[in-house]
């Protein structure tokens, strides 16, 4: 549903601070939304997402799993449902947070399908502990980030750096 943003360098803007407006970063969207927030997946990734949401004063409204993983079970006191049942409960205008990663082609295709049909995010999370890569962290470390960016001289490397930065800020899988 959300569209990929392009870095405004082509328009003459070269300051990385302008790569993505604060209100379009994943943690700001989640902090201020009134839409239901649901987790796709359980386990360690789900635990980490719940912890990250708590840092911004939010809790998930529900959780669903792929059809093969839906059993009579709960995750953090929430019933684990199918996507169809979750959609019946919350409607299509929900925010889906992916709580796991995969390199399995069928799973990746399902994630692309979810991204095309819903507000779908896969936020970067601290592996062990530490700060969220949110807008405040980004601005606090902008000098180091800009210095690293300046080390790349070819456009392909710079574009990749921008895409990684856009992913880290937006949580969008299109990057």
What are these regions (language model features)?
Residues 1-175:
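Hydrophobic, well-ordered beta-alpha structural blocks that scaffold small-molecule cofactor pockets
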């Amino acid at each position: 549903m959300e569209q990929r943003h392009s870095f405004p360098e082509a328009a003459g803007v070269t300051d990385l601070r302008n790569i993505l407006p604060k209100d379009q970063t994943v943690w700001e969207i989640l902090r201020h939304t009134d839409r239901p927030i649901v987790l796709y997946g359980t386990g360690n990734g789900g635990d980490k997402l719940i912890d990250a949401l708590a840092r911004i004063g939010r809790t998930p409204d529900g959780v669903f799993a792929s059809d093969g993983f839906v059993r009579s079970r709960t995750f953090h006191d929430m019933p684990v449902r199918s996507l169809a049942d979750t959609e019946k409960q919350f409607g299509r205008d929900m925010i889906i947070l992916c709580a796991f990663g995969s390199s399995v082609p069928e799973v990746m295709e399902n994630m692309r399908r979810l991204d095309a049909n819903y507000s779908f995010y896969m936020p970067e999370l601290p592996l062990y502990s530490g700060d969220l890569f949110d807008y405040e962290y980004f601005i606090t470390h902008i000098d180091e980030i800009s210095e690293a960016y300046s080390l790349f001289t070819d456009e392909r490397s710079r574009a990749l750096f921008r895409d990684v930065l856009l992913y880290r800020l937006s949580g969008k899988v299109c990057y």
